[in-house]
């Protein structure tokens, strides 16, 4: 019998039995299935004892029955990204990828994230919660037009609208209310959109996102072939360093760990404005973290293993 130890053998010993959790019942289920499938295939290629689990099909008891040594969380949105799954895994004593309970809950709440950023002196556009019967004229006076209406607890730009009139604001509020009971309006920042990925202690290269329609919505993120991702992003070296630093500080402000992504706008005066943080970013063929990692010299399989190595308790 050969004593040769292959990379796959070493990976199985190091990581144990890994369950990739994806799917779920949130509005981001479709994207999560794609992310989870890509991660699972990658782990199998790397020789990891990996198994996929659609959380909608068995819940926590089904996951526990698989007896994972670690969980790779690829379930976006509610339950998977908001601290719920993280808390359950901590109660079960199962290590998992990504941020902990509090950071996940904060990252999923756009308004509380912005409150924390403001408390840390970090730049983020002004916003107003649209509660009860909003005073539409007061909202417009506070934020100006155009402005953005967002569900507070959704990702992937689901339910988000850019509005230019009072009537459009009312309609956008109704649309966002289909996805969440908590709705916010935010000052619209005209300019260039950037995203910065974080992996462990490393800040990956920034990506500039260009969309012909001017709005990086769900269709542009996951289905459009006309969305452009610019790497290098076109910023001067010092500007990109400053952008990376503000994104790192934004991630740390909510207590983020492991990996994540921060979305930013740059206005006509060259100022950066933090939009939101993603604690379970997409891992599809259109996703931004894999693109940034590739530009930094990490292929997809290496990236997935790096994320797995940041597992809590490892």
Swiss-Prot record:
InterPro entries: ATP-grasp (IPR011761), ATP_grasp_subdomain_1 (IPR013815), D-Ala_lig_Van_CS (IPR000291), D_ala_D_ala (IPR005905), Dala_Dala_lig_C (IPR011095), Dala_Dala_lig_N (IPR011127), PreATP-grasp_dom_sf (IPR016185)
Cofactor info, note text: Binds 2 magnesium or manganese ions per subunit.
Residues the record lists as binding Mg(2+) 1: 263, 276
Pathway: Cell wall biogenesis; peptidoglycan biosynthesis
Record field: catalytic activity: 2 D-alanine + ATP = D-alanyl-D-alanine + ADP + phosphate + H(+)
Main location: cytoplasm
Record-level Gene Ontology MF annotations: ATP binding; D-alanine-D-alanine ligase activity; metal ion binding
A GO cellular component annotation in the UniProt record: cytosol
Cofactor needs: Mg(2+); Mn(2+)
GO terms, biological process: cell wall organization; peptidoglycan biosynthetic process; regulation of cell shape
Binding site for Mg(2+) 2: 276, 278
NCBIfam families in the cross-refs: D_ala_D_alaTIGR, PRK01372.1
UniProt family annotation: Belongs to the D-alanine--D-alanine ligase family.
Listed name of the protein: D-alanine--D-alanine ligase
Organism for this UniProt entry: Chromohalobacter salexigens (strain ATCC BAA-138 / DSM 3043 / CIP 106854 / NCIMB 13768 / 1H11)
């Amino acid at each position: 019998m050969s004593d040769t130890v292959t990379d796959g053998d070493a990976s199985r010993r190091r990581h144990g039995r890994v369950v990739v959790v994806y799917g779920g019942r949130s509005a981001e289920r479709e994207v999560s299935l794609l992310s989870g499938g890509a991660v699972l295939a990658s782990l199998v290629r790397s020789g990891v004892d990996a198994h996929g689990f659609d959380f909608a099909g068995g819940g926590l008891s089904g996951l526990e029955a698989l007896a994972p040594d670690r969980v790779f969380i690829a379930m976006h949105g509610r339950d998977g990204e908001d601290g719920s799954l993280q808390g359950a895994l901590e109660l079960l004593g199962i290590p998992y990828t990504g941020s902990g309970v509090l950071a996940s809950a904060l990252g999923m709440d756009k308004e509380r994230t912005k409150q924390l950023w403001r408390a840390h002196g970090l730049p983020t556009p002004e916003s107003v919660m649209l509660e009860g019967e909003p005073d539409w004229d007061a909202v417009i006076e506070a934020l100006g037009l155009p402005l953005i209406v967002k569900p507070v607890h959704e990702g992937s730009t689901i339910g988000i609208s850019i509005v230019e009139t009072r009537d459009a604001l009312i309609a956008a509020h109704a649309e966002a209310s289909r996805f969440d009971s908590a709705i916010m309006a935010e000052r619209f920042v005209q300019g260039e959109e950037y995203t910065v990925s974080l992996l462990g202690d490393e800040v990956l290269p920034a990506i500039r996102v260009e969309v012909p329609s001017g709005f990086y919505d769900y269709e542009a993120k996951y289905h459009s072939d006309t969305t452009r991702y610019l790497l290098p992003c076109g910023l001067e070296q010092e500007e990109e360093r400053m952008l990376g630093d503000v994104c790192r500080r934004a991630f740390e402000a909510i207590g983020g760990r492991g990996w994540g992504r921060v979305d930013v706008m740059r206005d006509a005066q060259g100022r950066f404005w933090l939009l939101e943080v993603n604690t379970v970013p997409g891992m599809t063929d259109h996703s931004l973290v894999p693109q940034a990692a590739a530009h930094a010299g990490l292929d997809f399989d290496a990236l997935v293993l790096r994320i797995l190595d940041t597992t809590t308790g490892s």
